[in-house]
Amino acid sequence: MTDTLFDRADIDALLAGRHPDPFACLGPHRHDDQIVVRALLPGAERVRALSPDGAELGTLACVDRAGCFAGTIAHDGGAPHYLLSIDWPDAHQVTDDAYAFGTLLDEAALARFSAGDPEAVLDCLGATPVRIDDTDGVRFAVWAPSAQRVSVVGDFNAWDGRRHPMRLRRPSGVWELFVPGIGAGERYKYELCAADGRVLPHKADPCARATEAPPRTASVVADVAALHAFAWHDDGWMHARPRHDDRYRVPWSIYEVHPESWQRIPEQMDRSATWDELAERLIPYVKGMGFTHVEFMPIAEYPFGGSWGYQPLAQFAPSARFGPVEGFARFVDRAHAAGIGVLVDWVPAHFPNDAHGLAQFDGSALYEHADPREGMHPDWNTCVFNVGRTEVSAFLVASALAWARRYHVDGIRVDAVASMLYRDYSRKEGEWVPNVYGGRENLESVAFLRRLNDTLHGDAAPAGVVTVAEESTAWPGVTAPTADGGLGFDFKWNMGWMHDTLAYLHEDPIHRRYHHDRMTFGLVYAFSERFVLPLSHDEVVHGKGSLVAKMPGDAWQRLATLRAYFGFMWAHPGKKLLFMGSEFAQWSEFAHDATPHWDLLDAPAHRGVQRLVRDLNRAYAAEPALHALDCHAAGFAWLIGDDRDNSVFAFARRDDTGRLVVAVCNFTPVPRAGYRLGLPAPGHWRELMNTDAASYGGTNAGNDGAVWAEAVPAHGEAWSASLRLPPLATLWLTPA
């Protein structure tokens, strides 16, 4: 009888966790004129089949004490519909049979996935609560083409990989299973058996929409319906987002935030603030400081806090450190209501090699390159995404789309682009593989980045999504259109400007005359790309010192130099980015497990720097001359670029209607009276900004709020004014 109801070979394969097709033996099957039901339920004591109204249809006999049951059930000739009544040692369960359901995913959708369609990733993969034939449950689907068996495990089956082996959908390599009777909130992972027979450590879902909070590592079934039905209130914001060339003409002043440490809750074991708590505190702060955007360091779930988020393992899930995923949607909605844009750092270059993650996901190099000369990053000991693989490229593009669609983010900043573009990045001779032409350019990454930008700027994404590249080399055309051979980004971080100017300011003022070109060189290439000027977290960590600590001199000189630098930066062509804590001149470096030193704001000097940044932001946003032509040479002209003996710089900013702002910077502690400056218009000029104002912590030296441009030629202009230049300060002048 056992041989008739349940083949011994099937039993052995199922119990060993290596059956190639569990649906071929489990669930209902016709045998002559009977319906035979087979079930694998390790630990069960008794199993019966019931009709939907509770009538008994038959008993499933135990055909193997390890948990195999089989029996015939009464039927009316149609498709059998039954429930399994299971007696466990300490519980009773009535459930639909997962193996009574047919295939789940449409063949056409799977074909689109194999062809590299990111929409198919979003449509097919992950854990999705669904209803099938009036039965609620969760559809699981995961890509693992080299595995010989995949099971979904969780609290619902005691994490036993024998209980829910999945169906392989050839040729896509996607495994699927509908588990009835469970829903949102369930914890789960996948158990995979590699081609060589190894049972791998349980893997988190690469496409999970939600996760457990670290250090726990399970994926969580998200309430997809609730996410889709989220009551957004930002239609006006979304429709008004600047499109195409307009996005380059508006002010961008970005406050970069490490959300895990911006504020913590000391009375609750010093935990991180939730998204709702951040909405209450961070949004008003950003708004009050005059920033236009907040940019979060990576928030996709990451296991190691010390990575600051730059080693994510759940590309689709906001970190559970900050509460449920809906909390992030609420944060973005409230930010938009306050007129604040939200950017997120996004990491497509590499991923950590944690056992529960993507590395060797199905026992093979699935997401990474197989050759360590391509697949391992020597600096970070991480795995490099194989973006040349169709499905991997689609997976990453789908992730970017998900952030734009599900959470209405206004843009992504793509991390470590240089490491993607060069095959020999941070590698010695013999440690890298040339491209098909023998060169060092990573052609697959170039194609991926172009595709990413075309997708986010196309009809698939909400209009107005912005992409920013952290690219530290001179790769040409990072912000050029893909149609013209460029990578298609909207903006690129100007790392060269940042390194040069900080190196200049690190010099003692008496020596700055010998390094004058560091401050002017950035204008040689300032309009070759569309730039963001980044004073980011990278510059205030790992022994580099905080911004103010980089400056020489006593405390007053350091603070004054930083204020002058901020005045120079906010007047310089390019959008602005400032890392948290720098806006009030924090003395210590960034520490991911400690908040910024907010107590410094008890000191007037630090409150003054904070007040200056606020006023710079407000003036920058209010004055089109300072932002409308940030990306065009017509918006900038040197007035004084060669006064290296006095370490003085002066330049004019203008918009295309003729509005003017002139910035004058004195980077020595020597006040300079009677300094003649050529000006592009005659008459009365008022001081729009003076970083040496007493309210900012300065000496209040200056020009009593105004100067007069008379008909005395200077610096190539027909008019000029005699100025008093405060020590270590920047002035902004505008025609009255």
Curated annotation (Swiss-Prot):
Any Gene Ontology CC annotation: cytosol
Classification via Gene3D superfamilies: Glycosidases (3.20.20.80), Golgi alpha-mannosidase II (2.60.40.1180), Immunoglobulins (2.60.40.10)
Active-site residue list: 415, 470
GO-annotated molecular function: 1,4-alpha-glucan branching enzyme activity; cation binding; hydrolase activity, hydrolyzing O-glycosyl compounds
Any Pfam family the entry gives: CBM_48
First and last residue of the signal peptide: none
Keyword hit for Glycosyltransferase: yes
Family to which this protein belongs: Belongs to the glycosyl hydrolase 13 family. GlgB subfamily.
Protein name: 1,4-alpha-glucan branching enzyme GlgB
